[in-house]
Amino acid sequence: MSSTASSSFSLSIAKPSSFHRPGFYFGLRLPNSISMSSEGFVPRSSVELNRSGLRVSQTRSPIRASAATQVMDLSVGETGFKAPTIVEVDLGDRSYPIYIGSSLLHQPELLQKHVHGKKVLIVTNNTVAPLYLDKVVDALTTGNPNVSVEHVILPDGEKYKDMDTLMKVFDKAIESRLDRRCTFVALGGGVIGDMCGYAAASFLRGVNFIQIPTTVMAQVDSSVGGKTGINHRLGKNLIGAFYQPQCVLIDTDMLNTLPDRELASGFAEVVKYGLIRDAEFFEWLEKNMQALMARDPSALAYAIKRSCENKAEVVSLDEKESGLRATLNLGHTFGHAIETGFGYGQWLHGEAVAAGTVMAVDMSYRLSWIDKSIVKRVHDILNQAKLPTTLPETMTVEMFNSVMAVDKKVADGLLRLILLKGPLGNCVFTGDYDRKALDDTLHAFCKS
């Protein structure tokens, strides 16, 4: 068997067009400058996959100014609090806003306008509940006495992201006699958001839900885009559904109670956006990582906003991960193998993604697809964020191969990977690579 894997599908992307920099989508150059017009429209690529291959055409689609501009909205609303910045996830009649700002739980109208029935179920965990459950209940019920709020408190941790824990959500929903007009609210990090979203997608064949992410990881990544699900003992996120929320409310004040390790974990996903599609953002991160680690409010707000803009644009173009969206999984194939092989909860998700990103970058360099300077810059920025760049000693080549064989990106028995290729800010999603480079990377990082 040849050492070269092959695939008919290869995808090349760059940074978001709204950032006024030249780039590539599916290997084709976009205009050098794409900006907001006076009519409030921005050009956007329309991507179609047909029998003859990929075709890209330029269309003009309405996008709310809040999703296309780079200026933070600092206006003061009627409540006396600053109005949030809004990033729109453009999915036609299923579009929804991401509200970003401080003191958003003190602006109850933001949540209440997305609750359409009279019953709400808050899904949270035993770490977040003592800190924010009462505040969210107040935000849902202040001036809104007809709404009835129930809650279910789950154990905290990735190891509880399973079917047994999910059943506790269904038990509470059924015991509370919730109907199809109810709303589920995910209050917590990525584990809670994924489980609550999957519960909402499944309960009575689908009810509304809202995301209130409380970690950097959830705020910049998992709460946006509608990926929901649970883990299986044989692999991470193998059971789930695409199911979009009514809105995402990101109150940056919630990060004040986030442990340092959880804070750093989230920055792995932030760095990812710079590597795969937004080189200018990566350069900003290199200069501002210390401010982010010190929880500088303005730096955090900007990093969250820019990350959400990147995620929202990709999701708007490829909701169901048919190609473009898969590139958001840089480092995740290796990272998921680490989480599964080492044991769920031993490392935080972002820690595993950081180490997985280093492996993906190493493999990209072995393929001669990137310059060695990029390898060093990735190591340096992850070290700044105090994230791991080596593997747990117990990980073996055999463990990686076993777990990656059932990865969601395997197609017809072929493992497709997200790798960097070209200048910083460009990547490919492909199965067309020299298998020896993958083997060499695995043996370089594993002791056996």
Tell me what each language-model feature is.
Residues 51-76, 81-87, 262, 268-271, ...:
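C-terminal charged capping/lid subdomain of soluble metabolic enzymes
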Residues 198-291:
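A glycine/threonine-rich phosphate-anchoring loop and its flanking beta-alpha core
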Residues 170-187, 196-211:
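Non-catalytic interfacial helical region
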Residues 191-198, 219-220, 336-337:
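Short glycine/serine/threonine-rich phosphate/pyrophosphate-binding segments
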